[in-house]
């Protein structure tokens, strides 16, 4: 059964045929995504005071405090179904929302202002040279500790997790670089490889003071945007990137699957480290809850109450959350569109400007170099592109915006409820036809026409009375003419052998 769920206007969500929602509507469930963030062993690293000081200099002083975080795979999988890489936003019933730069700073404590993280891929020979020079030890290719310039996270932990008490400062720096490489490889730069991290990041920690001048938060968001975009394709079964950020973002904004809060402290991800982070709710239930989101379930500006916890140097950069700019992390280039989600800043949401289509095929090296150069130029001008509502204003439901949004988006994914509604609308049409047929004077028809009409009437009458649908149709008003796409409630007659359930079973078979 082909179901056209939209969008009515495909000019924005032009990749609908690739998106997982198209598979969901066809009943092709891919199941839960495999979440590739590996924080469970972070606590096994024993850092000395010297190492902690170097980690602070490198810009990860707050981030390292978060440590292991239990992930709710069902919730994450449901959120990914709402992500659209055409706009880098979640498409929810009340409009678009996204993870913005300021939220990276608040939730993770990472720097969102500074130099972009750029570089190029390295070969195996260069990677081994980097390990020898910056780590002081070499992984073994024979033992599969290194492959394609990527080292195993387990090798880093096994070799460097405890720095000798009598270590020289050079050895301390090597162990600290190994920890930082492990930290980013298991969190913000985690990949679908799962247990490996690229050595290309290692030179970023050669000078710890310089490392502290990078915009790690912007790079983390670029990687998460890319990971969400990839995972939103129906062909994918994994998701990587900083899933702690994704999950905490949801807890702050959406009253769905939230655990009990811990004591508030900075970074704000620590608020959600208490017991109960895992949930037994399945994907289909989260899908339904996201379909049913109403204003009471959304907190547009959740961080205002924590203002007294935010360090001054972090607070001074939060304005960049409203920067319409380009995020960079090595070869990854992603667009940051706060203008599509101004209600998250307490602003009125107008209809946003059209997003230019991205050509994701046949990316040549020279095209990538040109794009990277332009992206870095845009990032350098990030402070000049702070967006605001036309005329300012408070959060309001803008009728023009919601009317536009209804045309360009897809906000309902709970397929079972939609199909039941379609079945009930079909029954309403059958009821109308039966009533119309009953008003026809059969004596005016020829014998052959009369026989056909009586057969049709009997067929509709028998169908409607099967399972009690005649009474349901009358009492629920299903005989009334309805506008197209008008919501129809689903009756509950306590029986399992009715037309609706049989048709749904047939559709699922």
Curated annotation (Swiss-Prot):
Residues 477-509 are annotated as: Disordered. This is Protein MAIN-LIKE 1. InterPro entries: AminoTfrase-like_pln_mobile, MAIN-like. It is found in: Nucleus. Residues 488-503 have a biased composition (Polar residues). The keyword DNA damage does not apply. Pfam families: PMD. One of its GO terms (molecular function) is transaminase activity. Keywords: Aminotransferase, Developmental protein, Growth regulation, Nucleus, Transferase. It comes from Arabidopsis thaliana (Mouse-ear cress). Disruption phenotype: Strong developmental phenotypes, such as extremely short, and agravitropic primary roots, small aerial organ size, altered shape and pale white leaves, bushy inflorescence and reduced number of seeds.
